Amino acid sequence: MKFKYHRWFQALVVPLVALAFHIFFGYRVIGRENIPEGGCVVCPNHVQLPAPPFAAVALGGKTPIRLMAKKELFRKKIFAWLIAALGAFPIDREGADITAIKTALGSVRAGQKLIIFPQGTRHAAEGETKKGAAMLAVKTRAPILPMYITEGKRFRCRATVVIGKPFTPDPKQKDYGLIADDILRRIYALKEQV
């Protein structure tokens, strides 16, 4: 079953979630001025806390946000409708998911912010990366926006998101692994600003 993205729903929900995050997590954002106009590939680290909503709220409710999410999250219809309406779309992490890649490319080219976790999973080590974010940035010639989310292992721990300066990888660089490593290095360099 296919579920739709509803920009109006996202614009309504994100500020409410931001308020809840401020109350329950002492949520704060550093570097919001670094968010570029137009489409970009947003690359946060993947943490135990609810990383996708933390990243989306950091971008604010005024910009269209899309998010690649593992297909397993779309198994329950009500939850699938909710996350799709908020901008998520499924990706099969086991193989080349052409539909997800086309959706991602189209989103960035349409001026939307695409959130993609370069580590692919919360269980990846700090140095492990996937190449998808690098490939999308090169193919769209869009800037990459590194983002660091503090790691918290318990409910109601203080949460901080640091948004780094955007950078655009060399479109001639075809070694996506090198770009992916650079993305991860830039993400974890933001840790010092917390």
Where in this protein do the model-derived segments appear?
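Short amphipathic alpha-helix with an adjacent loop that forms part of the alpha/beta core around
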Residues: 33-35, 106
